């Protein structure tokens, strides 16, 4: 009986450590990568269905223009909701991954280890993304605001709290769930690729490199590169679904993920679903590395291993 109680206590501690470590790791990473996230958001929205003009000629041009006209503060637009989004999503995603993986019986060098990690990553990612989606919606709208400041029908927000308040007033609570399913699908795909690739790559790397920061970085670089290609079409659709609504002159133009992808490809060509790809990679690569490295270190810290 006492053994079972101790096991339950240890499992609860592992979940708590995983959640707290994931949240703190994502906040640290977000502070560094938010400017490139803002650039990615604007690149994905410009030229939308040929209804808006093209402002930026790539990642570097966007970064320079935003810094020149809006300064450092402009590059960190949406940072507060980004913190809440990442802490919620990554805390749940990283905190529950080991729990789900263990429940599925995923163990290195055993049958179906990769597939079980894939399922665990997708499930953990979808749950985390759905929980953090309202914060992501507010973040996207705040990051895009200065692109549409001359649009008389666009409603800007003075703060994250004001954004939530205005969205609820104009669109109802349902407005905060806009794009939630697409966000869950996007992150399920990304998490499945990232976490399963990271785990498998880490096990391979450990055959040649001692367990430590270099092993984490190499594993994270591989996971970050692969996940960008798989996620970008979902990411473009999610950004556009978040931004549409009663707060801009375009109004309701998409019914969901597939409708958004179809209309985007039809009006802008197939390459449009890869808008912001390099910004996405430049953000996701370092963000993946920083998040997973911080995650490993925080887990060791809270477990008393450091």
Curated annotation (Swiss-Prot):
Topological domains annotated Mitochondrial matrix: 37-83, 139-174, 233-276
One GO biological process term: oxaloacetate transport
Bilayer topology term: Multi-pass membrane protein
Transmembrane feature ranges: 16-36, 84-103, 118-138, 175-195, 212-232, 277-295
Coiled-coil segments: none
Subcellular location: Mitochondrion inner membrane
Domain of life: Eukaryota
SUPFAM superfamilies per UniProt: Mitochondrial carrier
Family listed: Belongs to the mitochondrial carrier (TC 2.A.29) family.
Protein name: Mitochondrial substrate carrier family protein ucpA
């Amino acid at each position: 009986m006492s053994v079972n109680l101790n096991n339950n206590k240890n499992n609860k501690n592992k979940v708590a450590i995983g959640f707290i470590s994931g949240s703190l790791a994502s906040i640290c990473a977000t502070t560094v990568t938010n400017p490139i996230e803002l650039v990615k958001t604007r690149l994905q929205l410009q030229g939308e269905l040929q209804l808006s003009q093209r402002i930026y000629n790539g990642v570097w041009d966007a970064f320079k223009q935003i810094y020149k006209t809006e300064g450092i503060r402009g590059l960190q637009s949406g940072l507060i909701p980004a913190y809440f989004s990442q802490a919620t999503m990554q805390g749940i995603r990283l905190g529950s991954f080991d729990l789900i993986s263990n429940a599925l019986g995923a163990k290195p060098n055993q049958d179906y280890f990769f597939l079980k990690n894939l399922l665990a990553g997708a499930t953990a990612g979808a749950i985390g993304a759905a929980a953090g989606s309202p914060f992501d919606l507010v973040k996207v709208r705040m990051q895009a605001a200065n692109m549409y400041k001359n649009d008389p029908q666009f409603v800007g927000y003075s703060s994250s709290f004001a954004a939530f308040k205005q969205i609820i007033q104009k669109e109802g609570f349902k407005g905060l769930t806009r794009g939630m399913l697409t966000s869950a699908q996007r992150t399920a795909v990304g998490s499945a690729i990232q976490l399963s690739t990271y785990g498998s790559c880490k096990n391979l790397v450990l055959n040649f490199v001692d367990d430590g920061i270099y092993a984490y970085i190499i594993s994270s670089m591989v996971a970050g590169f692969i996940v960008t290609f798989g996620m970008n079409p979902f990411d473009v659709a999610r950004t556009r679904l978040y931004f549409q609504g009663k707060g801009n002159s375009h109004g309701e133009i998409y019914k969901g993920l597939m409708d958004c992808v179809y209309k985007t490809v039809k009006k802008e060509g197939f390459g449009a679903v890869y808008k912001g790809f390099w910004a996405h990679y430049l953000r996701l690569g370092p963000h993946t590395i920083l998040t997973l490295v911080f995650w490993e270190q925080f887990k060791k810290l809270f477990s008393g291993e450091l």
